């Protein structure tokens, strides 16, 4: 619990760096499956040559702060910066829209169960991001013990998507939640036996 989501962390670093350095996203990727917290993310950015050293320094400085925040949960977290000769990139406004959008997406536990102590009721995971030319695909997984809470979480993400131009939303593989019956003889017997 509390592990860093590499995609969200990358967006945070880039967003914070944008205050000091102009850059343009060439490509971005991270995560492997939508139901796991991504441990790796990478992004190729184009930076004016005169700002390369500033960008590296700023990213290292910002990463140091994040490393301290996640020292207990992710002690092996690393940042690798290498130079590339790639030149094609999103426009400046598109770059900022993308990193602001990623950073604003909900992620993690949204609500604990009011019925079962210590059990998560509703959560969401930003699991995968991949870019291909001018298209960026983001995969998220929302889960809930409550059907209405699940719908609300999905609709919250859809609403955020509709705030941007040229964004398509696809909902797939929805699994309706089920709840354990509160009164059930078998559960009562198992609970008594377990004590």
Question: What is the predicted function of each stretch?
Answer:
Residues 47-56, 162, 168-169, 189:
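Solvent-exposed, well-ordered amphipathic alpha-helical segments
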Residues 132-186:
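C-terminal structural cap/anchor segments
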Residues 56, 95, 99-102, 123, ...:
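A general structural signal for well-ordered alpha-helical packing
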Residues 14-18, 22-28, 154, 179-195:
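Active-site-adjacent substrate-binding region
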Residues 63-67, 161, 194:
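Conserved hydrophobic residues forming the short capping helix/wall of the S-adenosyl-L-methionine
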Residues 1-143:
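Midchain, well-structured core segments that form catalytic/ion-binding scaffolds
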Residues 127, 141, 158, 191-194:
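Generic hydrophobic alpha-helical scaffold/packing signal
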Residues 75-85, 107, 112-114, 164-187:
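Short N-terminal secondary-structure initiator segments
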């Amino acid at each position: 619990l509390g592990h860093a989501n590499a995609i969200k962390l990358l967006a945070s670093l880039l967003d914070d760096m944008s205050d000091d350095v102009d850059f343009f996203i060439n490509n971005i990727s991270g995560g492997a499956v939508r139901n796991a917290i991504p441990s790796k993310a990478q992004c190729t950015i184009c930076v004016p040559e005169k700002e390369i050293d500033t960008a590296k320094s700023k990213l290292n400085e910002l990463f140091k702060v994040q490393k301290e925040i996640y020292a207990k949960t992710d002690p092996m977290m690393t940042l690798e910066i290498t130079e590339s000769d790639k030149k094609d990139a999103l426009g400046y406004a598109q770059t900022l829209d993308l990193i602001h959008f990623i950073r604003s997406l909900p992620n993690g536990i949204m609500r604990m169960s009011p019925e079962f102590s210590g059990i998560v009721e509703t959560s969401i995971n930003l699991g995968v991001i991949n870019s291909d030319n001018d298209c960026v695909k983001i995969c998220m997984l929302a889960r809930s013990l409550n059907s209405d809470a699940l719908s609300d979480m999905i609709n919250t993400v859809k609403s955020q998507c509709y705030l941007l131009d040229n964004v398509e939303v696809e909902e797939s593989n929805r699994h309706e939640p089920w709840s354990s019956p509160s009164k059930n003889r078998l559960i009562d017997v198992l609970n008594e036996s377990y004590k």
